[in-house]
Amino acid sequence: MKSNQTGFSAIEMMVVVAIIGILAMIAIPSQMGRIIKEQVVAAIPLADIAKEPIAASWKAAKTLPVDNKEAALPAAEKVVSNFVSALEVKDGVINITFGNKAHPKIAGKILSLRPAVIEESQVVPIAWVCGNAKAPNQMTIKGENKTNVPDEYLPQLCR
């Protein structure tokens, strides 16, 4: 007697489900890193509100604002966004603290944007050095780097 079987048997279906489950377990963690990195990148433009007054202070008096108040910004905890719980200016450095809807792996972590200047020429615009990156040639970085976001979550420009 010949059997005309159509469709999947229960065992074949379980094998397919197991393979899909294994592929999902591999894919989800690799996507998590990308999502966290996107949150870091999304937070960086918030620093633009502090860059202008810092650059103006350097150009006018060759000094950098010591805090948010001197940079004419609200208190650090009042400058927030979806992934940022505070934006602090300290000696010209912009420190972004991650929080609010940020992934737990970066919540409470800091990304610093430090001004790089040419000491002898205030006219040359400030270059902003992100995170652990190095200064452009002939420029001096001002302030302390407080970046403690793991390198794997920093964009290439900040490593």
Where are these regions (language model features)?
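Short alpha-helix boundary/capping motifs
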Residues: M1-S3, K59-A60
